[in-house]
UniProtKB/Swiss-Prot annotation:
The active site is at residue 143. It catalyses: guanosine(46) in tRNA + S-adenosyl-L-methionine = N(7)-methylguanosine(46) in tRNA + S-adenosyl-L-homocysteine. The gene is trmB. It is an enzyme of class 2 (transferase). One of its GO terms (biological process) is RNA (guanine-N7)-methylation. GO terms for cellular component: tRNA methyltransferase complex. Keywords: Methyltransferase, S-adenosyl-L-methionine, Transferase, tRNA processing. Belongs to the class I-like SAM-binding methyltransferase superfamily. TrmB family. Its EC number is 2.1.1.33. Catalyzes the formation of N(7)-methylguanine at position 46 (m7G46) in tRNA. Pathway: tRNA modification; N(7)-methylguanine-tRNA biosynthesis. This is tRNA (guanine-N(7)-)-methyltransferase. PANTHER family: 3-DEOXY-D-MANNO-OCTULOSONIC-ACID TRANSFERASE/TRNA GUANINE-N 7 - -METHYLTRANSFERASE (PTHR23417), PENTACOTRIPEPTIDE-REPEAT REGION OF PRORP DOMAIN-CONTAINING PROTEIN (PTHR23417:SF14). It comes from Vibrio cholerae serotype O1 (strain ATCC 39315 / El Tor Inaba N16961).
């Protein structure tokens, strides 16, 4: 296992200090996940390296790129890729069993427009994602850090929003978030309303109806069972 370092923020979103946000635990891969990693990584896996990706080289075409941070076991990401062959998808997940499961599902579904990485997303963004190149960034059901004293650990902060803004296409790129914690949804809206260069795409209030392109995830199903709502939030890069 290896430690992943992220930032701690003040209330106004400025970096206070670098902290350990989580420890990357490799976990135990099932035989199927291990086989999928060995078989599919050469064609679908991208190793971390501190140089910018060339999307044409990665996918073999110039289709719009959708990037998802923290795809879990990858079921919804694979479904989205299968349902939208006209788009390219890149998923970033730090837990290798999830990456293995995603690759196994992708192989079974026969998708060819999906690539995956097993690395800290902040480092990937800083060193590998070209500016002004993403059609959509997806952040679905991130850790809510529901205790108030842990809110500063939430990934959606002003510095993160600025990092996202730089990578989205000007005038069209969309940052799509979803959470089943109302307080985190309110936090997301508060941060994004303060972040320069974004406009909320909701036509009624702060939230959009669940888009057809986002499959029903196990997290959302859990939320329904617990009586939680689910909030979808979309902001478009305007500048």
């Amino acid at each position: 296992m290896s430690e992943v370092i992220t930032q701690e923020y003040t209330e106004d979103g400025k970096v206070l200090r670098r902290i350990r946000s989580f420890v990357r635990r490799e976990g135990r891969l099932t035989k199927g996940q291990e086989a999928a990693m060995k078989e599919c990584w050469p064609t679908m896996g991208i190793d971390y390296q501190p140089e910018l990706l060339d999307w044409q080289q990665v996918f073999g075409n110039d289709n719009p790129v959708v990037l998802e941070i923290g795809f879990g076991m990858g079921a919804s990401l694979v479904e989205m890729a299968k349902n939208a062959p006209e788009k390219n998808f890149l998923g970033i997940e730090v837990h290798s069993p999830g990456v293995g499961a995603c690759l196994a599902s992708a192989r079974e579904a026969g998708v060819t427009n999906l690539r995956v990485m097993c690395h800290d997303a902040v480092e990937v963004f800083a060193h590998m994602i070209p500016d002004n190149s993403l059609h959509t960034l997806q952040l679905f059901f991130p850790d809510p850090w529901h205790k108030k004293r842990h809110h500063k650990r939430r990934i959606v902060q002003l510095e993160f929003a600025e990092m996202v803004r730089q990578k989205l296409m000007i005038g069209s790129g969309v940052f799509h978030m979803a959470t089943d914690w109302e307080n985190y949804a309110e936090h997301m809206v508060e941060v994004m309303n303060q972040a320069p260069g974004f406009a909320n795409l909701a036509t009624d209030g702060d939230y959009v109806p669940r888009p057809d392109e986002r499959p029903l995830t196990k997290f959302e199903q859990r939320g329904h069972r617990l009586g939680h709502g689910v909030w979808d939030i979309k902001y478009q890069r305007t500048a």
